[in-house]
């Protein structure tokens, strides 16, 4: 599955794309102090609750908040084993 991350000034939205539809979406407040590990613990808990094992094979990050991009990149590489495409 593709992990799509849309980071705006107010909220960051995470979504799982299965190739045909969004299998799940989650939203959290954007905070530049949040670490990659915090993102992962939160996201994995929601994935587990929804029955979505963390089988992410790719990721894309769209962001208007440059200070957050580094930790989102680390989230993708460290916890999902993929190098994200960053746009925006």
Specify the residue positions occupied by each region the protein language model found.
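Short, low-complexity, intrinsically disordered N-terminal peptides in bacterial proteins
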Residues: 1-2, 51
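Short beta-strand-loop/turn "lid" adjacent to the catalytic site in phosphate-handling enzymes
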Residues: 50-88
